[in-house]
């Protein structure tokens, strides 16, 4: 959430930033809603003060045996009570209108983020590896998996509908191995703390991660009002919800391997074949909670951690900076890591690493205190995929495929699959 004090002071900067995201000016409307709310609150506070004063004056009038004045004051107090009864309801309405408007505004892009309409304006900043040249036409992952008889979309559809997959045998083991490998790298070598988190969370937790109210249609909600997590970012970031941290404890770095659940409401007709876009998938997530001064350096570090996983797996990839038109709602800057898929003949996203500033910290009321300073600041948060397990499995299938349809297992994964070197039908 943005800082309304900043918006009041720099309304033109807000509208300039929103224009970079293709959004109409909002500062005037927000300031008006805020003024209405604050004016009403001031009236309520004034009425409460007068009620309290009048109540004391009643006692003074009675002590002075001035019954007429006491009755007059009682009538005034009753009148104020009637006003406050309706005013409280109005205050709630005005506050909800203001907070709803403020909570639907995206974060402010950093100055070095390129302005663009969509992904076509993203900027490639580096490559790793060279896509392999095959002496045969490389297949896509769904053909490879089905030919191995270890990737079943028909049975998955009977079980759950579209955008689900049943993996079996060596492919199921390889998927499990990938998640364990990624988590081991981040925890043992990159300095993240492994965390096992709930998969069901409350409204305020999803709100704190900036996925509510704007993205409710993209999520799954249970009948008792809880939400299935779309990413472990949601619970990991909220581990510091409503907490005051000491600066000496920062940064906090968390990592978790979880299933993720997404309705893909806005993805009709996109990636309908295969495992690229699923309602349920595994992902290793990285989250950092840090200070304003350290957040940009932490973004570079987190992105390097995600890249390191792909380097160890020998997968060609490129890293891009997302333009303002392609960047996520809560992000100030995002690096996407895109892995090469020879079957598709293109790069596809496998990780996003974003710095969110204090956007989530403000929603969560998560703050930190500097040593010797009583002033509290909102924490800065970052999140990144470390990486998407299913998409990494896809990349291994396509990049390590052989002419006979078998799949070579990368060396670093072989200890996780009991020394298996190749997957065959």
Curated annotation (Swiss-Prot):
PROSITE patterns given in the database record: AA_TRNA_LIGASE_II
Entry EC number(s): 6.1.1.11
Pathway info: Aminoacyl-tRNA biosynthesis; selenocysteinyl-tRNA(Sec) biosynthesis; L-seryl-tRNA(Sec) from L-serine and tRNA(Sec): step 1/1
A Pfam family reported for this protein in Swiss-Prot or TrEMBL: tRNA-synt_2b
Main location: cytoplasm
Cellular compartments annotated: Cytoplasm
GO cellular component, one term: cytoplasm
InterPro entries: aa-tRNA-synt_IIb, aa-tRNA-synth_II, aa-tRNA-synth_II/BPL/LPL, Ser-tRNA-ligase_type_1, Ser-tRNA-synth_1_N, SerRS_1_N_sf, SerRS_core, tRNA-bd_arm
CDD domains: SerRS_core
Keyword NAD: no
Binding positions (ATP): 262-264, 349-352
Keyword Protein biosynthesis: yes
Binding sites annotated in the UniProt record for L-serine: 231-233, 285, 385
Keywords assigned by UniProt, alphabetized: Aminoacyl-tRNA synthetase, ATP-binding, Cytoplasm, Ligase, Nucleotide-binding, Protein biosynthesis
GO BP annotations, alphabetical order: selenocysteine biosynthetic process; seryl-tRNA aminoacylation
Swiss-Prot/TrEMBL catalytic activity: tRNA(Ser) + L-serine + ATP = L-seryl-tRNA(Ser) + AMP + diphosphate + H(+); tRNA(Sec) + L-serine + ATP = L-seryl-tRNA(Sec) + AMP + diphosphate + H(+)
Family membership noted in the UniProt record: Belongs to the class-II aminoacyl-tRNA synthetase family. Type-1 seryl-tRNA synthetase subfamily.
The record's note on its domains: Consists of two distinct domains, a catalytic core and a N-terminal extension that is involved in tRNA binding.
Matches recorded under NCBIfam families: serS (TIGR00414)
Function of the protein: Catalyzes the attachment of serine to tRNA(Ser). Is also able to aminoacylate tRNA(Sec) with serine, to form the misacylated tRNA L-seryl-tRNA(Sec), which will be further converted into selenocysteinyl-tRNA(Sec).
Name this polypeptide is given: Serine--tRNA ligase
Lineage: Bacteria, Pseudomonadati, Pseudomonadota, Alphaproteobacteria, Hyphomicrobiales
């Amino acid at each position: 959430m943005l800082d309304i004090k900043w918006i009041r002071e720099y309304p033109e900067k807000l509208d300039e930033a929103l224009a970079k995201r293709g959004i109409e000016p909002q500062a005037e409307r927000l300031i008006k809603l805020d003024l209405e709310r604050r004016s009403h609150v001031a009236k309520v506070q004034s009425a409460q003060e007068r009620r309290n004063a009048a109540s004391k004056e009643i006692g003074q009038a009675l002590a002075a045996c001035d019954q007429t004045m006491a009755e007059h004051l009682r009538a005034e107090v009753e009148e104020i009570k009637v006003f406050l009864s309706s005013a409280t309801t109005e205050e709630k309405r005005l506050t909800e209108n203001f907070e709803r408007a403020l909570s639907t505004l995206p974060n402010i892009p950093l100055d070095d983020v390129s302005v663009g309409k969509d992904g076509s304006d993203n900027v490639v900043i580096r490559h790793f590896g060279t896509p392999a040249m095959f002496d045969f036409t490389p297949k896509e992952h769904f053909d490879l998996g089905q030919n191995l008889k270890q990737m079943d979309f028909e049975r998955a559809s009977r079980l759950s509908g579209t955008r689900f997959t049943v993996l079996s045998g060596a492919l199921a083991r390889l998927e499990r191995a990938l998640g364990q490998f990624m988590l081991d790298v981040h925890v043992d070598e990159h300095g993240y703390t492994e965390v096992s988190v709930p998969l069901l969370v409350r409204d305020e937790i999803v709100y704190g991660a900036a996925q509510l109210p704007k993205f409710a249609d993209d999520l799954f909600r249970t009948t008792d009002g809880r939400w299935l997590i779309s990413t472990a970012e949601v619970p990991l970031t909220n581990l510091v919800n409503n907490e005051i941290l000491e600066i000496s404890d920062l940064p906090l770095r968390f990592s978790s391997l979880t299933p993720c659940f997404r309705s893909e409401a806005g993805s009709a007709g996109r990636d309908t074949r295969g495992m690229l876009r699923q309602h349920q998938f595994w992902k290793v997530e990285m989250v950092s909670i840090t200070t304003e001064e350290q957040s940009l350096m932490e973004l570079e570090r987190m992105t390097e951690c995600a890249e390191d996983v792909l380097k160890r797996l020998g997968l060609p990839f490129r890293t891009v900076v997302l333009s303002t038109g392609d960047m996520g709602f809560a992000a100030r800057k995002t690096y996407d890591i895109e892995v090469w898929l020879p079957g598709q003949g293109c790069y596809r996203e496998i990780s996003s690493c974003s710095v969110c500033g204090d956007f989530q910290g403000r929603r969560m009321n998560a703050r930190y205190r500097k040593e010797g300073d009583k002033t509290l600041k909102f924490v800065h948060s970052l999140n990144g995929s470390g990486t998407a397990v299913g998409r990494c499995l896809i990349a291994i299938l396509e990049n390590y495929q052989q002419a006979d349809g078998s799949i070579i297992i990368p060396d670093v994964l072989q200890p996780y699959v009991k020394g298996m070197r190749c997957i065959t039908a």
